[in-house]
């Protein structure tokens, strides 16, 4: 399970070190794509196959399903970790996540999220609902 929070700095070429704690579970190659809430999602190749299978079941007749699939897949790239443990985050994905310098990596069960430090701090400090309020509603999700 992917969990924890780590901070790194992106270099001038758009490369960033993937935290060692995540490398073992993600493998040397994985998929990076546009995420929700102005972050990036990182999936192992195995988990990406599961995501693709779910996306294939979405009805083409539904406008929202088509739009989400386009958004999600158009931004997806396969990444390979270099010898220094880094990946290159393409410019379009850095722009989507507003990443300029400092980044936060967050393990979220089956994926890693990559956030601009500033965006993460704003998101986590200004969430409309408290952690306790979210926890109260988890029973509705059978958790």
Swiss-Prot record:
<feature type="domain" description="SpoVT-AbrB 1">
    <location>
        <begin position="5"/>
        <end position="47"/>
    </location>
</feature>
<dbReference type="InterPro" id="IPR035642">
    <property type="entry name" value="MraZ_N"/>
</dbReference>
<dbReference type="GO" id="GO:0003700">
    <property type="term" value="F:DNA-binding transcription factor activity"/>
</dbReference>
<keyword id="KW-0804">Transcription</keyword>
<dbReference type="Pfam" id="PF02381">
    <property type="entry name" value="MraZ"/>
</dbReference>
<dbReference type="GO" id="GO:0009295">
    <property type="term" value="C:nucleoid"/>
</dbReference>
<comment type="similarity">
    <text>Belongs to the MraZ family.</text>
</comment>
<dbReference type="InterPro" id="IPR035644">
    <property type="entry name" value="MraZ_C"/>
</dbReference>
<dbReference type="InterPro" id="IPR020603">
    <property type="entry name" value="MraZ_dom"/>
</dbReference>
<dbReference type="InterPro" id="IPR003444">
    <property type="entry name" value="MraZ"/>
</dbReference>
<dbReference type="InterPro" id="IPR038619">
    <property type="entry name" value="MraZ_sf"/>
</dbReference>
<keyword id="KW-0805">Transcription regulation</keyword>
<keyword id="KW-0238">DNA-binding</keyword>
<dbReference type="InterPro" id="IPR037914">
    <property type="entry name" value="SpoVT-AbrB_sf"/>
</dbReference>
<keyword id="KW-0677">Repeat</keyword>
<dbReference type="GO" id="GO:2000143">
    <property type="term" value="P:negative regulation of DNA-templated transcription initiation"/>
</dbReference>
<dbReference type="InterPro" id="IPR007159">
    <property type="entry name" value="SpoVT-AbrB_dom"/>
</dbReference>
<keyword id="KW-0963">Cytoplasm</keyword>
<feature type="domain" description="SpoVT-AbrB 2">
    <location>
        <begin position="76"/>
        <end position="119"/>
    </location>
</feature>
<protein>
    <recommendedName>
        <fullName>Transcriptional regulator MraZ</fullName>
    </recommendedName>
</protein>
<dbReference type="GO" id="GO:0000976">
    <property type="term" value="F:transcription cis-regulatory region binding"/>
</dbReference>
<dbReference type="GO" id="GO:0005737">
    <property type="term" value="C:cytoplasm"/>
</dbReference>
<comment type="subunit">
    <text>Forms oligomers.</text>
</comment>
């Amino acid at each position: 399970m992917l969990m924890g929070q780590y901070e790194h700095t992106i270099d001038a070429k758009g490369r960033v070190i993937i935290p060692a704690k995540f490398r073992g579970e993600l493998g040397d190659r994985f998929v990076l794509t546009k995420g929700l809430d102005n972050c990036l999602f990182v999936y192992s190749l195995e988990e990406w196959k599961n995501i693709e299978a779910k996306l294939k079941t979405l009805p083409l007749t539904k406008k929202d399903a088509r739009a989400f699939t386009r958004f999600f897949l158009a931004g997806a790239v396969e990444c390979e970790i270099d010898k220094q443990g880094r990946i290159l985050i393409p410019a379009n994905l850095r722009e989507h996540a507003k990443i300029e310098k400092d980044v936060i990596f967050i393990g979220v069960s089956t994926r890693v999220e990559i956030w601009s430090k500033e965006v993460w701090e704003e998101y986590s400090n200004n969430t409309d609902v408290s952690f306790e309020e979210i926890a109260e509603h988890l029973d509705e999700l059978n958790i």
